Amino acid sequence: MTVVIFLSVLLGAILLGVPVAFALLICGVALMLHLDLFDAQILAQQIVSGADSFSLMAIPFFILAGEVMNEGGLSKRIIDLPMKLVGHKRGGLGFVAILAAMIMASLSGSAVADTAAVAAMLLPMMKTTGYPLDRSAGLIGTAGIIAPIIPPSIPFIVFGVASGVSITKLFLAGIFPGIMMGLCLALLWWWQAKRLNLMTFSKATKQELCISFKNSIWALLLPVIIIGGFRSGIFTPTEAGAVATAYALVVSLFVYRELKVKDLYKVFLAAAKTTAVVMFLVAAANVTGWLITVAELPIMLTELLEPLIAHPTTLLLVIMLAVFIIGMVMDLTPTVLILTPVLMPLIEEAEIDPVYFGVLFILNTSIGLITPPVGNVLNVITGVSKLPFDQAAKGVFPYLIMMIMLLLAFVFVPELILVPLQWIS
């Protein structure tokens, strides 16, 4: 009965158009009434404690760093360097999009923000040079979902806080899978570009390449500082967010000089709005997560799937299928917040590496960002490209299949994630 109430209230509220955070609170109140636990003071305490975590402080810092980079010219220079490197090849703008998305992923950790930035800069150029708009939009959208995998990743921070898994290990574990995603996209785009009569650009001279590298070096140093810093123990992932923000501000204000002091209010306001949405969602989900634990739903799920515990690969396939279906209709962050407390006891019982599972889980929920009918990233590229939703979904489809195949490869061959993690660590 508890499961029925949980699902019916949550899904009913979402279908009625209630924002997810408020839907989670309504669901939490319904569960408290059902379990005869309702107390306004306890409800308030759970909401406050949900956002009361030192690790969560990284989220506003990385969001602010992303806003500063977009306004301060770092994003523009990041795209210019791949343009000079591979823009002259057949289908070069596609490779530029992939490279730019990977570099920007290592700066902000937000799929929606990275996709919007890359699409706004490259899609008009791809359209005027004769690239198929649906495939181009699909490629950029899929490249955008690399952001939650390559550190610094906001979804990894959320998962780490919800599960108790080391955020530093999650960050390091995401590096190789993120690179693999980029390589697979580049391979598929190369195969597609061979069959298309696409316009090519003149090859950049060594002087132009040097100038572009010189202009972008300050932006490229940021991921090196962040990853090198928390890997060597100089600072934690949370402190890395503050370092990223400070670095982006200094470079934008005093090196590139594209960000003016008068623009800071607008930048901070945009970051504050985005942060408020995410943190309220985290706080609301804590109420539901607490009640899920009190109602012993994780124990019930463990008992239900007990025959599969001895077969970790089969268990992971079942979980990944369920997460994929849920990810089709729910955004990444609420999916992570709702399912993590339910799934982690099962993962521990099956003795599956929690860091490995975290990478699979976030990759799967990231795929949901480009999967109809919801797909937030899919909506972004639809808006930027002005394509009908069905055409954008058609453009994403081959890359979506590629990402699903890569996810399955990681499920069947855990060493693809665990061995590089050992090397990096």
Predicted regions and their residues:
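Alpha-helical transmembrane segments of multi-pass membrane transport proteins
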Residues: 1-425
